[in-house]
């Protein structure tokens, strides 16, 4: 017992005599532990944020994209193929092919800015179907959304987000006003409620127009950038996806063993990918932080051995 007390006193004296070395060693331990805690907290926070964004589109929804599923940078060029057109849309919406599908919205991206009188704003503009607002689960605060009739007649109308409305019209009511996009006039028929970020989109910066209008008057293209779909229930999502895959493979004459010229992303698949990425990232960052902790621990051992 006396021997242990003597050793402790000797060690304390050594630590006191070498204050700077002891302080730096303890600092290394503190930084190491703090780094691990911070890294784990940040990784978990980022994961929760991403998961909430993915879940924002609803468990019944999935997205059909052109090109094969990219596995690396060399595959991203396949995303710009023209494999999704009206015949694909008609085949997918045919209940005999995909009985469990409830709603479908073709989507096209429209680059460029919008303007009103002397004000100009750069939004995120999509040409979409009338069900897109329901698919994204957002609400109209003023005015109305466009209808299936507007899509069929290629109406030159828009629904805008609150940030777009504020930048172009200030405190004035935008309903009925005409904004300019690519030298064409579009009438504002609705303003989306202030929503913020959802499904990786800043809803407040959105401009939505009928996809038929966008493809005819703004883009001069006959293909879609993607097709959003919703199954009639979460239990039928996998069945609906399988039916879509079978339908498109048959339509495109893809033989067994050949790669698809399209790919489908569901909420479940996205969550699995995010989980894998964040797990690997977490292990990597925690390992780096643990090195600092190990170095500090070795320093403490050296001081104790010297003392």
Predicted regions and their residues:
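Peri-transmembrane interface segments
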Residues: 228, 244, 255-289
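Short, strongly hydrophobic transmembrane alpha-helices
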Residues: 20-48, 296
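Mid-to-C-terminal secondary-structure elements
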Residues: 126, 130-146, 155-255
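Short aromatic/hydrophobic contact patches that present stacked aromatics
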Residues: 30, 39, 226-230, 263
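Interfacial "coupling" helices/loops that link adjacent transmembrane helices in transporter permeases
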Residues: 18, 298-307
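N-terminal Sec/SRP start-transfer signal
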Residues: 1-31
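Hydrophobic, regular-secondary-structure patches
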Residues: 44-124, 167, 215-216, 239
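Hydrophobic residues within alpha-helical transmembrane segments
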Residues: 12, 23-30, 179, 284-290, ...
């Amino acid at each position: 017992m006396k021997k242990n007390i003597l050793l402790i006193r000797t060690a304390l004296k050594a630590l006191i005599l070498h204050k700077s070395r002891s302080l730096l060693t303890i600092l290394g331990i503190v930084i190491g532990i703090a780094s691990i805690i911070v890294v784990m907290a940040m990784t978990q926070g980022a994961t929760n944020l991403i998961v909430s964004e993915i879940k924002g589109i609803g468990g019944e929804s999935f997205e059909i994209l052109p090109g094969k599923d990219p596995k690396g940078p060399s595959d991203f060029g396949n995303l710009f193929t023209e494999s999704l057109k009206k015949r694909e849309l008609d085949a997918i919406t045919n209940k005999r092919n995909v009985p469990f599908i409830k709603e479908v919205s073709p989507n096209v991206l429209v680059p460029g800015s919008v303007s009103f009188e002397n004000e100009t704003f750069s939004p995120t503009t999509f040409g979409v179907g009338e069900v897109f607002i329901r698919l994204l689960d957002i609400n109209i605060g003023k005015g109305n959304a466009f209808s299936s009739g507007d899509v069929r007649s290629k109406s030159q109308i828009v629904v805008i987000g609150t940030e777009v409305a504020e930048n172009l019209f200030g405190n004035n009511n935008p309903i009925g006003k005409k904004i300019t996009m690519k030298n064409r006039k579009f009438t504002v028929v609705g303003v989306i409620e202030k929503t913020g970020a959802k499904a990786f989109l800043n809803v407040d910066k959105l401009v939505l127009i009928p996809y038929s209008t966008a493809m005819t008057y703004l883009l001069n293209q006959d293909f879609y950038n993607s097709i959003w779909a919703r199954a009639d229930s979460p239990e039928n999502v996998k069945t609906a996806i399988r039916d879509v895959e079978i339908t498109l493979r048959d339509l495109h004459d893809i033989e067994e063993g050949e790669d698809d010229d399209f790919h489908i992303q569901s909420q479940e698949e996205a969550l699995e990918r995010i989980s894998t990425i964040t797990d690997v990232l977490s292990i990597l960052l925690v390992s780096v932080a643990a090195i600092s902790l190990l170095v500090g621990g070795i320093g403490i051992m050296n001081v104790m051995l010297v003392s």
